Structures are given as structure tokens and as C-alpha cells.
């Protein structure tokens, strides 16, 4: 899962959106630096990452990647799941339009920015102003996201080519998304993530 899915599942679970978004920028035990609700959100994010990586649908999808891109398949798929969530938002969350949800999420996350790591603050500058969460529905934007990550981290250069794997298996990936994401939503609503 990437940014949008983590925020969405956090909302459904009544968990800290701030902690769920911040989690990738926090190493080790967050309890000494953040309030309990944010800490719980960080731990929820970590549980979701482990759970998602171990879902049969996700393990199957990783196998569809070519040898040269398989090592970045998990990262690529995380971004792709956000694409499907953004694309199908009106079906998934008919009572909370995406634009309104993004505004709500931004307001929640903004409360922790003064005490956040600089890299997280920098991400937030772009995430909200450039409307990443709304633009995930556009596959050209997904390609730009993958290229941007490859540019920032040369060891992830294979992300650039992983676009072709997404394109080749688009329909099958979308089908897998519909298999697992509604289950995750139900688990979030039961606070079982």
C-alpha cells in the first residue's frame, strides 16, 4: 500500500492518519518521539505493509514481473494499488468524495508537521500541493512517480522499467486489487489491522 491506501485504511479504522503517513520516515521505536495515537498509527502502517506483502494475490502479482524488475515489484505494486483505489474511489467510498477526503487527510497530517522529520515535511509539501492522491488515477502520473523514485534512489533504477510490467498485467492486477482490498477495508472497520 502507498499513501492513499494507508490514509484510507487508517480512516476506516479510526486510527491516526498522521501516524499512518509518517511511518515510512520513522525507524525503530516511535514511542519516545510521538504521542500515543501517532505511535499506534505508525504500528498500524507497519502491520499493513507486512500483511499486504504476504497476501496471496500480491505474492502472485510479484511473480508477473520480469527478472530485471522483480526486486522492485513490491514498491511498484504499492503505487499501483493506490492507482486502483484512486481510480475506483467513487465505488469504494461513495459517501466521502476523494477531494473531500484529501482535504480531511491533509488537515489531520498538518498537525504533526512542526515536529516531523525534514524528509516527511518535504514530502508533504509536494503530496498536497501537487495533488498526488487525486492524480494516482492517471497511469501517466504513476509512471512519473516510479521515475521520480528511481531518480532519487539510483539503486531503485529498475522502477523505471517496472512500468512495463504494470502495463502488461493491468487487468489482472486490477482483478487482484478487487480480491483483497475490500477484505482489508472490512478488517480496518473492525479494527483488525
Swiss-Prot record:
Superkingdom of the source species: Bacteria
Known catalytic reactions: holo-[ACP] + H2O = apo-[ACP] + (R)-4'-phosphopantetheine + H(+)
A Pfam family per the record: ACP_PD
GO MF, any single term: [acyl-carrier-protein] phosphodiesterase activity
Enzyme class: hydrolase
Protein EC: 3.1.4.14
Keywords, alphabetical: Fatty acid biosynthesis, Fatty acid metabolism, Hydrolase, Lipid biosynthesis, Lipid metabolism
GO BP: any one term: fatty acid biosynthetic process
TM spans (from-to): none
HAMAP family, sorted: AcpH
Family: Belongs to the AcpH family.
Function according to Swiss-Prot or TrEMBL: Converts holo-ACP to apo-ACP by hydrolytic cleavage of the phosphopantetheine prosthetic group from ACP.
Record's protein name: Acyl carrier protein phosphodiesterase
Organism in which the protein naturally occurs: Salmonella agona (strain SL483)
This protein's encoding gene: acpH
Amino acid at each position: 500500500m502507498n499513501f492513499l491506501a494507508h490514509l484510507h485504511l487508517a480512516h476506516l479504522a479510526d486510527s491516526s492518519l498522521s501516524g499512518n503517513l509518517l511511518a515510512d520516515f520513522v525507524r525503530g521505536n516511535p514511542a519516545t518521539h510521538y504521542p500515543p495515537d501517532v505511535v499506534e498509527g505508525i504500528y498500524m502502517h507497519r502491520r499493513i505493509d507486512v500483511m499486504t506483502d504476504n497476501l496471496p494475490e500480491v505474492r502472485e502479482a510479484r511473480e508477473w514481473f520480469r527478472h530485471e524488475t522483480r526486486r522492485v515489484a513490491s514498491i511498484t505494486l504499492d503505487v499501483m494499488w493506490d492507482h486502483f483505489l484512486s481510480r475506483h474511489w467513487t465505488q469504494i467510498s461513495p459517501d466521502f468524495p476523494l477531494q473531500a477526503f484529501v482535504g480531511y487527510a491533509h488537515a489531520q497530517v498538518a498537525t504533526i508537521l512542526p515536529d516531523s522529520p525534514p524528509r516527511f515535511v518535504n514530502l508533504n509539501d509536494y503530496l498536497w500541493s501537487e495533488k498526488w492522491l487525486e492524480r494516482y488515477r492517471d497511469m501517466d502520473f504513476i509512471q512519473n512517480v516510479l521515475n521520480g523514485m528511481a531518480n532519487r534512489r539510483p539503486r531503485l533504477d529498475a522502477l523505471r522499467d517496472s512500468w512495463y510490467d504494470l502495463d502488461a498485467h493491468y487487468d489482472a492486477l486490477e482483478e487482484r486489487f478487487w480480491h483483497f482490498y475490500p477484505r482489508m477495508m472490512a478488517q480496518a472497520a473492525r479494527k483488525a489491522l
